Amino acid sequence: MQQKYVIALDQGTTSSRTIIFDHDANVVAISQREFSQIYPKVGWVEHDPMEIWASQSSTLIEALARAGIHSDEVASIGITNQRETTVLWDKATGKPIYNAIVWQCRRSQPLCESLRAEGYEDYIRQNTGLVLDPYFSATKIRWILDNVEGAREKAEAGELLFGTIDTWLVWKLTEGKVHVTDPTNASRTMLYNIHQQAWDPVLLEALEIPASILPEVKPSCAVYGKTRIAGEGGEIPVAGMAGDQQSALFGQLCIDEGMAKNTYGTGCFLLMNTGLQAVQSNHGLLTTIAVGPKGEVNYALEGSVFMGGATIQWLRDELGLIRDAQDTEYFALKVSDNNGVYLVPAFVGLGAPYWDASARGALVGLSRGANRNHIIRAALEAIAYQSRDLLDAMTKDSGVQLKQLKVDGGAVANDFLMQFQADITDVEVQRPKVTETTAMGAAFLAGLAVGFWQSTAELKHKAGVERCFKPAIADDEREALYLGWKRAVAQVTSESVA
């Protein structure tokens, strides 16, 4: 039977999805299933790994059924996943010894403070590219080893395995035969030396984590093993794997130095491919691993905006200014400018490049003429201003002047936001035809690994641009608007602006 399709398993923070693509990179079928969020204490977040597997495997079966596709028609299966989330399981039984500790979970903050006191902060920054934070996997692993009865003894006896969600899914798909991860996911553990591309013995010793529990790191574009869907049909290669943001970067074909994408979700994730050079940031950005044109290791700078789409939710849920997120464009266009109104959405502090956890939100520049439309417009503009903050930081760190910004995520449907993003950054913004770029990245990697597609050059014809937004304001207007933003930010932080 001719193999006409590749499948992407897209395992996210709140739901598991399966997306089937044909040879022209069209979406043939999608299946999605939500799973439980577990909050045992304030600041703690967990998932049930078995529920994640059940939700993911059921969407795989459902997507095939919806498309009327037989498993023998599938060339390969790729994986993209929520990053950092940590699972430890028994090697013999395959059963988790504790719930998955989710990337959002802050329980291991005291462990981070201990590492900071012991002087590891600079070492972690220089060798892993990350900041010392509970966000990453390392201190989550240590917490499980310290707090689950018998865990440390089992780990030291070689009876436990660790994985981020990609590793867990491959283990389950291959019925316990394969224990692997890829460099993009490994680079988010705070245990992986991104320069030597190996697990870091200094950090393993500092955190008292046995190396025997760690997965083998294989390329992002490779065949890891084989699976049968629901135990039926022929064996399908499990091939191609990347963490969600790196997968979106590859799905947008940002495979060369200086190419960047911004994902507009609850927050915003901006990644710039820096090629073979691991750029150390002086502006609070993360240095991480990306995927190059042949599936090889490239590096990237990563910055995140805490409040993107969440700012629009605030307008709707707390202020009642809109009924639906889609309404924002209509109201923003009812006024010709922001009338001097700026919203700084520092509801949970500000991330890069400010890193001010104590900052809080503010509406700045209100006059008697300010109205609902100006506030809604200011909320949309704030998303673009924060993205410019990140882009400017990336330009300073990398020395690369961006020419184009590829975009994805729910908010890219907002034409006003996309045009303002182009205007305020003086960069062309490209919106893709297929917005499922995270899943598409995993599909591309899986297809390339088995020869379903021959090269990334071939893929450039598959991943088209739906619309380009070109900068349409003068330089002096752009800089006046941005100066207003910087002054607004200065009112909620300790920064001063001339």
Curated annotation (Swiss-Prot):
CDD domains per record: FGGY_EcGK_like (cd07786)
Keywords recorded for this protein, A-Z: ATP-binding, Glycerol metabolism, Kinase, Nucleotide-binding, Transferase
EC number, as in UniProt: 2.7.1.30
Protein activity control: Inhibited by fructose 1,6-bisphosphate (FBP).
Pathway entry: Polyol metabolism; glycerol degradation via glycerol kinase pathway; sn-glycerol 3-phosphate from glycerol: step 1/1
Residues binding sn-glycerol 3-phosphate: 13, 83-84, 135, 244
Any one of the GO BP annotations: glycerol catabolic process
One Pfam match: FGGY_C
Binding-site residues for glycerol, renumbered to this chain: 83-84, 135, 244-245
Residues engaged in binding ADP: 13, 17, 266, 309, 410, 414
Gene3D superfamilies in UniProt: 3.30.420.40
InterPro entries, A to Z: ATPase_NBD (IPR043129), Carb_kinase_FGGY (IPR000577), Carb_kinase_FGGY_CS (IPR018483), FGGY_C (IPR018485), FGGY_N (IPR018484), Glycerol_kin (IPR005999)
Annotated residues for binding of ATP: 13-15, 266, 309, 313, 410
Record field: catalytic activity: glycerol + ATP = sn-glycerol 3-phosphate + ADP + H(+)
Transferase as UniProt keyword: yes
Function: Key enzyme in the regulation of glycerol uptake and metabolism. Catalyzes the phosphorylation of glycerol to yield sn-glycerol 3-phosphate.
Similarity section: Belongs to the FGGY kinase family.
Protein name in UniProt: Glycerol kinase
